[in-house]
Amino acid sequence: MRILLEFVLQIFRGLNTKTDETVIAQPTPEPTPEPTPEPTPEPEPEPVKPSWPISKEHMAYIMGRKLEEISDELMDDYATCCETFHIDPFSQAYFLGQCGHESGGLRYAIEWHDGSNYEFRSDLGNLEAGDGVKFAGTGWLQCTGRYNHQRFSDYLKFLGKEDPSIMEIGKTYTSQYYPFTISGFWWHDNKMNQYCATIPTVDSVGARVNGRYLPNGYEDRRKYSRKAFDIMGIPYPGN
């Protein structure tokens, strides 16, 4: 009996004895890094356009046109012209008066003649065949000849606005995209802002544009100029 009890006790003790187990710590897995999101590219800034010096309604009134005939692109070009060549409201009145007459109220940005009579005119820089037609009078004040177009193109390049199409295509391109700006270049090149600051008569300004006194169409120049001075709120300086 005693032997049996000892045997049972040994079994009972074995059940309550914890077996030592060696626990090997497992390394904590590294967290999977989240992918870095690609930076969202910032949109290209819109080019800043100068504000229009006058409204489309005012331009239509001065030029005797319907409002729907005055495009935003035309007004943008006018704004660029005035900003680039520092044409202030006083000079703008003279400028618009001359542009109005020379272009038939902004109807003709290329002279009526095809330009063949300018062929090989060295005084205009027309040294290559076809230059007469390609660079015939362009813009409202009819900038004429390879030489003058090249100078206009070079000036835009100097301003950081290079446009090779001016020389590659010629009058059909420039008259569409720069009718005011190429006219403003002539105005600037001939120091018309400085002249207008002396408060000259409209006829004397027309003589500088047209090349003689009294200028061709002087009554028409006066008509456009009167309306331009009226819109600018500036007294008409006289004929």
Predicted regions and their residues:
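N-terminal export signals and maturation junctions of secreted/periplasmic proteins
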Residues: 3, 14-80
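Non-transmembrane alpha-helical segments in soluble domains
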Residues: 9, 79, 96-99, 153, ...
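Short, mixed-charge amphipathic alpha-helical segments
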Residues: 83-88, 164-174, 196-197
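Acidic helix/loop microenvironments that form the catalytic cleft of cell-wall polysaccharide enzymes
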Residues: 99-102, 196-217
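Low-complexity, Gly/Ser/Thr/Pro-rich intrinsically disordered linker/tail segments
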Residues: 208-219, 223-239
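Surface-exposed patches in mature extracellular/periplasmic domains of secreted proteins
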Residues: 85-95, 108-111, 193-206, 237
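Short, intrinsically disordered N-terminal pre-domain segments
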Residues: 1-10
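Peptidoglycan-targeting cell-wall enzymes and recognition modules
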Residues: 47-77, 93-187
